Structures are given as C-alpha cells and as structure tokens.
Regions:
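Gly/Ser/Thr-rich phosphate-binding loop
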Residues: 3-58
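AMP-binding/adenylate-forming core of the ANL superfamily
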Residues: 71-93, 97-99, 105, 154
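Generic structural signal for well-ordered beta-strand positions
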Residues: 81, 107-109, 188, 194
Length: 213
C-alpha cells in the first residue's frame, strides 16, 4: 500500500471483501485495521452476497451469518442449500461442504469436488491444508484405498523431516501416503490452487517413480 491508500482506508468505516476465501496472511494484516472488515459469501445466482463474516475486531469470527431473509439447510452430502427469496426465485444447491450451527451461522469446510475418499474415510482437502499450510493436499488413484492422500510441496527438499512432523500431528487415516516435491504449485488465472492440475501432476510423477503400479 502507498501512503495515500492507507490514509483513504483509514477514512473508510466498513470494508467488504468478496470473490473467494481470505487466506491466513491477509486476515492477520486485516486484524490491525481500524476499519470494520467483512468477508462475504454468495453465488452468481444470488446476484449478491447472502451472508457476512467479520474478519477483525471483537466480533471477528470463523462463522458466516446469513441475512434475516435467508434460510439455510444441508443436503444428504452436507452441501449447503440456500433459500434466498429476495434475490433468487429458486432454492440453490451448492457444491460447498458446510457446517450449520444452532445460532444459524455456518462455516464452509471446502468444495464437494475436493473431498478425498480414502479407504472409506472422507477427507476434506481444504481442512487438511489449514493445518499444513503452505502445502497442498491432493489425491492419486490407489488400488487398495480408491484414492490416496498426497501432499505437494514446493522447494522443500527435506521430505523425511516433513513426514515425521505429519506423523506427529495427523491421525493415521489422514496422513499422506505420498509426499511429492514440485517446482511450484499449479494455480488458476485468479491465483487459486488449480486442483485438477495438481491431481494430474501428482499422478504423472508417481507413474514415473512407480511405472508398474
């Protein structure tokens, strides 16, 4: 930020951030701002956001709080269902795995597409990544497990030390079966993790290492 931008920000009472998840580093910076900062949750179909999460101050929370006119529920797969009649005529079925709390607030755990089914245990990649930042969790096909949890890391040569650390902090069924070092984590044009490319890259690397598996 240049000085002019900082001064302009100080004069702002409320700042709303949308368009994607807010990472931990940004949240840390935001926490020091005098401005009230909120993260929004919404979809293209809802035209605008339908819930807010306070990122700083005494009211900071990991939970999103929906607007009064919005009703939320979960599908059988724990994906979020949105009923927002003021902005959308139809009930919306999302691909976001969520948890709804008794006070009506909710947390987004990750995308349905990013659930790894490893030996019958369903593992949310985004939840593991919160514990393992800056590493990325993906999966590769596995004859016994169906999908094997795989950790991708960039420019980290000591995989043995990392493996030992993972053994300490993760339950057995969450521990990555493979730890792969790559030059850089594939990203989309808007800077998000390219999940599809990560899966392809991990599979190709393992086929190179173990061509007969």
């Amino acid at each position: 930020q240049v000085p002019e931008e900082k001064e302009r920000l100080k004069q702002t009472d409320i700042l709303i951030i949308g368009g994607g998840a807010v990472d931990e580093a940004l949240e840390t910076e935001i926490n020091h701002l005098p401005t009230a900062v909120y993260s929004t949750y919404g979809m293209t179909e809802t035209l605008s956001h339908i819930a807010l999460r306070r990122l700083n101050g005494a009211s900071a929370s990991e939970h999103y709080y929906p607007f009064p006119s919005v009703k939320l529920s979960l599908s059988a797969e724990n994906t979020l269902i949105i009923d927002a009649p003021l902005v959308c005529d139809e009930t919306l079925q999302t691909n976001d795995i969520a948890r709804i709390y008794p006070d009506g607030s909710f947390m987004i755990l990750g995308r349905k597409d990013n659930v790894i089914n490893s030996g019958g245990i369903k593992i949310q990649a985004e939840e593991m990544e919160k514990l393992l930042r800056p590493f990325v969790i993906t999966s590769v096909p596995d004859q016994r497990l169906g999908q094997a949890v795989t950790l991708l890391l960039a420019d980290q040569p000591d995989t043995e030390e990392i493996g030992n650390k993972l053994h300490e902090i993760l339950e057995p069924y969450y521990r990555p079966k493979h730890i792969l070092t790559i030059e850089s984590i594939p990203q989309t044009e808007n800077g998000k993790i390219n999940r599809a490319e990560c899966r392809i890259l991990a599979k190709q690397m393992l086929m190179t290492f173990y061509p007969h598996t």
